Amino acid sequence: MDKMNPVLKQTILEVVNNQLEALDPPETKQTYDRLVASGISDQEARRLIGCVVSSEIFDVLKQQQPFNHARFVKALNKLPILPWE
């Protein structure tokens, strides 16, 4: 996500922030808490979650199917390993 267009990066991070504030989906906050508790910084935890958000958006657009909650949660649970690794 570091080489991403700055406007797109900010938008993805805004999605992450909104998910954390709304607790929707709750797995985003659970993942954030797990990452921070493991010693990952706030900023890095948000960036990692943003990578999962961007990966899910890519999959939705590529497959022309609705958001897949199970796939999203599976990717969150694997962090800090990124979806494409």
Predicted features and spans:
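Structure-specific DNA junction-binding interface
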Residues: 1-85
